[in-house]
Design a protein with these regions (language model features):
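C-terminal outer-membrane/trafficking sorting elements
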Residues: 184, 723-806
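Acidic, glycine-anchored loop motifs typical of Ca2+
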Residues: 343-364, 736
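Edge beta-strands of extracellular beta-sandwich domains
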Residues: 125-133, 230-237, 798-803
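Surface-exposed, short loops/turns at beta-strand junctions within beta-sandwich domains
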Residues: 108-115, 213-219, 780-784
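Low-complexity, Pro/Ser/Thr- and charge-rich linker/hinge segments at domain boundaries
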Residues: 132-154, 231-269
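Aromatic (Trp/Tyr) and acidic
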Residues: 25-80, 91-105, 146-147, 153-227, ...
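Residue-level detector of functionally pivotal "anchor" positions at catalytic/ligand-binding pockets or at interdomain
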Residues: 134, 705-733, 747-748
Length: 806
């Protein structure tokens, strides 16, 4: 999906700078970090004569490529900065392309003045810009760049100054005021002053809070902090949330295995044919990328399931976490999920060729059925189920559609855990499909019974509970109901003595019993119901306590053992709160859900949207083979991929970052580098599934048409930000003007310099060293509209507003 953002941002740069020390170094943007810190952003790349991986990975970015050693080479309006700091981070894809990096140079300068034109001199060229509170991006303002939830009564942005090698900084003196304004009209919708939150250990930031709870649903908005600059655009609820829910849910579709990815369901014709449908019955032991297929083993055709991540494995973890979350979410919020909601194919022939969509079944159930389908193929006649599928190594070639992968895939061994989990999933899906596909429901119920009969007492208690709940709700079986009662009592006692002990493979226990809580047709035991309610509420309340212990909504305890993706797994932490809100409608629970889900949309120390295709500071290099293919075609990356994010350091550091990454706090330990698997890979079960179901609930089930970008607006003029001098030391006439305008000093004062700015503050014409009392300016080549003249005479600078007409 191509994010066509047309809002106009004031970045007035001379991109073709002269005198570059390195031909690959480009001046990209001017920002602020504070009222007296300017951020000059450069990008660089190294084009290698070879695509050899070893050569490529060992080629290092020069952190001193931007020349900061001599302060005299930098000037702002002729004044040298008092101090220079830097942050350098690599941003590379694969060894078939260049090594890339971003250099952010922090210049300590005099206090910036609203409406002032500045000339910046650097060792790599000069540029001119205008600083205004509403148009200069301040990177210290951290917001959800996509959609704050309209369901929440609490929302916020954070403000934190971080200067790379200069570290975290506090604001000196009185805390600044801010306002929130609609960027299309300029209307202020909320205002206040920054609130001191204090030092945050997890991020290393000294944090200030910007209250957004009074901002109404709508947008796009920006936050303007007086003297500092403005935030990136953001929206609240409405189309903003709807688009976020749509993109997030469809991330599951883009990871499907055994299906083409083509228009009109994909944004381009990515994968023309089915992939990975030929499976060899190897029955190999579990192991990472270590399954050898000879090619003489018995083979069969399969469909369904998902590619695990940047590879094409289909693993037990998908079965444990994906179908139960999809189906439980639907049962908790059936009003928010419908058919034709997410533009996914749901009509197929017997060989799973796509016939269309609109089968009358909610899309979320269709997705659960696709997630379950592969496990039906992996079930043997005796009821047992394989652990998954695997190959030797990873899909090859690298940047390809998955239907071009030439590797052979085989089955992994029969597994009791897979069989026990499949029993519950098959029974759950049988129950949900019964009103729509009764014959299919019967088949799934039979599969469930065979799986449970095979695994017997080798199933764990969570799987027993899941199966028993679903069997009782589907059939009314008395024995199954008694199992529900007995197991719930067992778990309730365990939770009293050891909170959280009943969780299973990152699934909270409530996923397995929640349908029993809300059952309306079968009789339920109210003692059991209360025990279930207590377990769920206690789980949700623990997450609220953790949420409140950090300045950013990271939700992940400091004590958590490092694992891939644990600092972007806000969905896992939010999910029990979501279920509790679904049950009780207590506002505090949906407030915490909403705020936790702001983190990976940009409300984090780096200000990065960790989800591809969303936000304004996006992930460019997810470790995803098909995304590298779509990038090579000029289509951008597959949207909706939530990468693993910060805090998961590899044993070997093979990328460039300054300050050194081990010295950074956990929430800043991230590099946008495709080969940092622990940071830029992802999985269907760890990072994608929870956003896929939570964001549509936060959007209240609204349907997005897939084309209307709510950020596709024209920004309000900056003219209101520039103080226009109405005194008559300088005259301009005629005004309005058709052809030529005269600028004259009424006091015979020499005009020294002249700048013509358009309505967005861009310098469209400039002339220096005039030294005349009168000058004529030809306006014939300029389009109609409002302009600002900045006229500098010996008496000082004057701003004049003028109108160009036909």
């Amino acid at each position: 999906m191509k994010n066509q953002i047309k809002y106009l941002v004031l970045i007035i740069l001379l991109l073709n700078v002269s005198g570059q020390a390195n031909a690959t170094l480009k001046l990209k943007e001017i920002r602020t970090a504070s009222s007296d810190v300017l951020v000059v952003v450069f990008t660089s790349e190294i084009v290698l004569p070879t695509t050899n991986y070893t050569t490529w990975i060992n080629t290092k970015i020069d952190v001193n490529e931007v020349k900061t050693g001599d302060v005299s080479g930098w000037k702002l309006n002729g004044i040298q900065p008092l101090e220079i700091n830097k942050f350098v981070t690599e941003s590379s894809a694969t060894n078939s392309g260049p090594k890339r990096a971003e250099h952010r140079i922090f210049l300590k300068v005099p206090l910036l003045i609203n409406g002032t034109v500045y000339k910046l001199e650097t060792p790599h060229g000069d540029t001119t810009f205008v600083f205004t509170n509403r148009t200069m991006f301040c990177e210290s303002i951290k917001t959800n760049q996509t959609a704050y939830s309209g369901l929440s009564d609490a929302r916020f942005a954070n403000f934190a100054i971080w200067l790379g090698t200069g570290g975290s900084q506090q604001i000196k003196g009185k805390l600044p005021e801010y306002n929130v304004y609609d960027i299309t009209s300029g209307r202020i919708v909320s205002k206040g002053a920054l609130e001191d939150i204090g030092k945050d250990f997890s991020s290393g930031d000294y944090v200030y809070r910007i209250d957004l709870s009074g901002v109404p649903e709508g947008g796009p908005y920006k936050i303007s902090v007086f003297g500092y600059g403005c935030s990136r655009p953001f929206g609240v609820g409405g189309d903003f949330s709807t688009r976020l829910g749509y993109v997030s849910f469809r991330s599951m579709y883009y990871q499907r295995c055994g299906i083409p990815l083509k228009k009109p369901y994909a944004w381009e014709d990515i994968r023309e044919n089915h992939c990975h449908t030929l499976l060899y019955d190897v029955n190999a032991p579990t192991g990472e990328a270590n399954l050898v297929v000879v090619g003489t083993e018995p083979s069969f055709t399969v469909y369904g399931g998902y590619h695990d991540a940047g590879d094409a494995d289909r693993r037990l973890y998908h079965l444990i976490r994906v179908p139960p979350v999809l189906m439980t979410t639907y049962e908790a919020f059936p009003e928010y999920f419908t058919d034709n909601q997410f533009n996914i194919p749901d009509k197929f022939d017997e060989n799973f060729n796509i016939l269309g969509k609109g089968n009358g079944i909610p899309d979320i159930i269709d997705e659960a059925e696709w997630a379950t389908l592969i496990w039906e193929y992996l079930q043997d006649p005796d009821g047992s189920v394989h652990w998954g599928t695997e190959t030797k190594g990873y899909p090859e070639p690298f940047a390809i559609p998955m239907d071009h992968d030439y590797k052979k895939y085989g089955t992994i061994r029969i597994d009791n855990e897979a069989t026990g989990m499949a029993a519950g999933v098959f029974m759950h899906l049988a129950r949900l499909l019964k009103p729509y596909k009764p014959e299919r429901s019967v088949e799934l119920q039979q599969r469930a019974e065979k799986a449970m009969a095979y695994v017997g007492n080798n199933v764990n208690n969570q799987q027993k509970l899941y199966f028993a709940v679903q069997k009782y709700l589907l059939t009314g079986d008395i024995v199954a109901h008694q199992q529900v009662k007995d197991l719930t009592s067992l778990f309730a006692n365990s939770e009293i003595n050891n909170p959280g002990s009943s969780n299973y493979s990152n699934n909270i226990l409530a996923i397995f019993f929640y349908p029993y809580l809300i059952e309306k047709e079968r009789p339920t035991d109210q003692v059991v119901v209360q025990k279930m309610k207590d377990i769920l509420r206690n789980t949700a309340d623990r997450e609220i306590t953790i949420f409140n212990s950090f300045a950013y909504p990271v939700g992940n305890p400091i004590t958590t053992k490092r694992q891939w993706g644990n600092n972007v797994n806000q969905g896992q932490h939010a999910y029990p709160c979501l279920l509790e809100w679904g049950l009780t409608k207590e506002q505090k629970y949906i407030d915490v859900v909403s705020q936790l889900m702001d983190y990976n949309q940009g409300l984090n120390p780096i200000g990065k949207c960790y989800v591809t295709g969303l936000g304004f500071d996006q992930v460019k290099n997810p470790h995803d083979r098909e995304s590298e293919y779509t990038k090579s075609r000029g289509w951008g990356v597959k949207p909706g991929i939530l990468v693993y994010g910060p805090g998961n350091l590899p044993d070997r550091i093979e990328f460039t970052i300054l300050p050194e990454i081990r010295t950074l706090p956990r929430e800043r330990q991230w590099v946008d580098h495709l080969f940092t698997y622990g940071m830029n890979e992802f999985t269907i079960h760890e990072t994608l599934i929870y956003p896929a179901v939570i964001y549509p609930v936060l959007a209240e089930g609204r349907i997005w048409d897939g084309t209307k970008d709510p950020f596709d607006v024209v920004e309000h003029s900056i003219i209101s930000e520039i103080k226009v001098d109405e005194q008559d030391k300088i005259e301009i006439y005629p005004n309005p003007v058709k052809n030529n305008i005269t600028i004259a000093s009424t006091e015979n004062d020499e005009i020294l310099n002249l700048k013509l700015l358009d309505s967005m503050g861009k310098v469209v014409f400039q002339v220096d060293k005039i030294n005349l009392a009168t000058i004529n300016l030809n306006m014939n080549s300029y389009p109609n509209g409002i302009y600002i003249l900045r006229i500098e005479s010996r008496s000082g600078a004057t701003f004049k507003k003028m109108i160009k007409i036909e």
